[in-house]
């Protein structure tokens, strides 16, 4: 994505290939699911949340007020964000610098949540995202793909889970070392989690922050977080990762024409 004045394609214009839209709250597992479906069906994987994170990171670096929309919009319009699809997600370049890891830090996550509530900034982002997916053949994940970015997407999945499960997933993602030999199914991980008092406090803090973000996302004026009327809701609260991936594949196949 760059600051271009090229015309943005109409989202309802005829595409060469389908669009798979994955929406849902923070920590639901959208990135993992999107990467899997992109590999399985030979599509590009585009993580729109990385675009908000990149703008938030640049706002942090420029000491901008996250509550002032116009300076943030001006910043976004002068920023070059490039998403390079990889096997496990996107490589994110901010003005030519790889920030793929930095944008996952907790300060950027918190800033992105505040930046994303501004309606004019979201409208600008939607135009960029439509341009990225105009030809189809993409799995695009975010919070308003099926409702605002591509309301005519051929496949729409709303991936959800309870706040407690999402909070635990996010905690383990950012705070706990990953054991490659351990059982990685969600129920096994949840049952095996033995936290120290400090870890438990950190986990509770992440849960509070996640609930606060849920509240902001669901109540913002522009493109609030909600399932599209024709989306298939996939609740992963009690499912293993393999079960989520299998059910999502079935959903995609049921909505696409036979090869």
Q: Can you describe what each PLM-predicted range is?
A:
Residues 1-19:
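Extreme N-terminal, non-catalytic leader segments
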Residues 33:
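Hydrophobic positions on the alpha1 helix immediately C-terminal to the Walker A/P-loop
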Residues 84, 129-136, 143-148, 152, ...:
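Small-molecule kinase domains that catalyze NTP-dependent phosphoryl transfer to phosphate-bearing small molecules
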Residues 26:
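The conserved Walker
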Residues 30:
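Conserved lysine of the Walker
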């Amino acid at each position: 994505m760059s600051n271009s004045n090229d015309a943005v394609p109409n989202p309802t214009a005829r595409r060469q290939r389908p669009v798979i839209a994955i929406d849902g709250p923070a920590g639901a597992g959208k990135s993992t699911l999107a990467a899997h479906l992109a590999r399985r069906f030979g599509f590009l994987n585009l993580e729109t949340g990385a675009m908000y994170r990149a703008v938030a990171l640049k706002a942090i670096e420029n000491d901008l007020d996250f509550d002032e929309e116009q300076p943030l919009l001006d910043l976004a319009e002068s920023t070059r964000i490039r998403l390079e699809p990889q096997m496990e997600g996107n490589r994110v370049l901010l003005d030519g610098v790889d920030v793929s890891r930095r944008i996952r830090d907790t300060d950027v996550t918190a800033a992105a949540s505040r930046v994303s509530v501004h309606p004019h900034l979201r409208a600008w982002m939607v135009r960029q995202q439509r341009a990225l997916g105009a030809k189809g053949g993409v799995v695009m994940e975010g919070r308003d793909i099926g409702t605002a970015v591509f309301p005519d997407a051929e496949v729409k999945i709303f991936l959800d889970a309870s706040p407690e499960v999402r909070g635990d997933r996010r905690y383990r993602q950012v705070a706990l070392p990953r054991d490659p030999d351990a059982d990685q199914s969600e129920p096994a991980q949840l049952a095996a989690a033995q936290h120290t008092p400090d870890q438990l406090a950190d986990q509770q803090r992440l849960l509070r922050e996640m609930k606060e973000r849920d509240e902001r996302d669901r109540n913002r004026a522009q493109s609030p977080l909600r399932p599209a009327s024709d989306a298939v809701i996939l609740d992963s609260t009690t499912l293993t990762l393999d079960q989520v991936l299998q059910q999502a594949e079935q959903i995609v196949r049921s909505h696409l024409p036979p090869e």
